[in-house]
């Protein structure tokens, strides 16, 4: 149990540190950070007429906003739950507080240049001047423009309108080298976002749950399990007998079983929280590529660090084949080492994200058929169709919430089993590892 708790703690820390800089998604998912360094934006503020608000329903914008991370929980209307902010700007220092200090939808504030833009913290460009990047200022509204960057690519740029002037907003710095639309801007966001809060909550519940189960085993030693212990024991036995032992082997499974259990239940709890429309749910944790990447990288590190000479010998100098073929097979095997965690990452991310998008798309039928409130009959028809299909998809999502942790756990166990397998024991469980090797070496979604 202590090993499991340590593994869970390290897992949460790794996930949090990986996902914090990657939570740069804005409300519509376009490139908001990569263009921030371009010279298109008006640096010192430009007088702008009006602050018109477009009430036209945009399903794509709404869907991408709901599956993205945010610096606050939004319930309904103007009801929000603020989250802690830890913002750092080079040359200015650290700014802390709750997200509520930046105001609400009807009364936004700029604090030290930071502005809340559709649930995500942005900062005014350095060209706004020292006076605007310090103290508090009332924000009239957030303006959105689609412009062409230096390469001719259309990007979304946001401006904060203050005292009749507009100031360009930058997204938080993201260490993706611009590959995913991020880049280094004028501030870093280390805040507790919705995803981070949900991960911490899932970790806390897991610690409390399994600590209680451990106490039950000590207190009722030799007796039939009861209460929470009776509820969780089938999960423990199933994962041990159907995943850990078959994939890793009798000799080594006990060492890695706590890690497999931690991964399984962490993903499961995050998935279940994502199905809850309000607190403590609504966060799309496993639908965030940074989180699934961290999980996959951790799984790969655990497997490869414990790889024995037999495993690495097959990777770099495959036995039993002609010498001139060995270099080619080495390239293939090394690629396989990268493809395996990559397939883990994409499989979990794609399945969870697709489910959320489908459900939100079905709900959007109500507003699409209703023509933004112009057609009551259309809204009613959309409601009947949308609700019926949404209920069906929720059942599918609930199934996926359990299936995906199982897939992730069994593939992780197969990677570990292949790494620690000893040559003398190949005949004892070669079937499971051979199947895993054939299905997984090319990264194909054999279990999806």
Q: What do the predicted segments below correspond to?
A:
Residues 182-187, 239-253:
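Cytosolic juxtamembrane amphipathic/interface segments immediately preceding
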Residues 422-448:
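Terminal, Lys/Arg-rich, intrinsically disordered segments and adjacent short helical elements
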Residues 1-7:
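Positively charged n-region of N-terminal signal peptides that target proteins for export
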Residues 4, 224-227, 248-257:
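Membrane-interfacial loop-to-helix junctions in multi-pass inner-membrane proteins
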Residues 208-247, 307-314, 423-427:
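Juxtamembrane interface elements at the cytosolic ends of transmembrane helices
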Residues 2, 14, 20-225, 437, ...:
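Perimembrane topogenic segments of multi-pass inner/organellar membrane proteins
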Residues 242, 256-278, 284-424:
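Hydrophobic alpha-helical transmembrane segments and adjacent short intramembrane/lumenal linkers
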Residues 7-16:
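Bacterial N-terminal signal peptides
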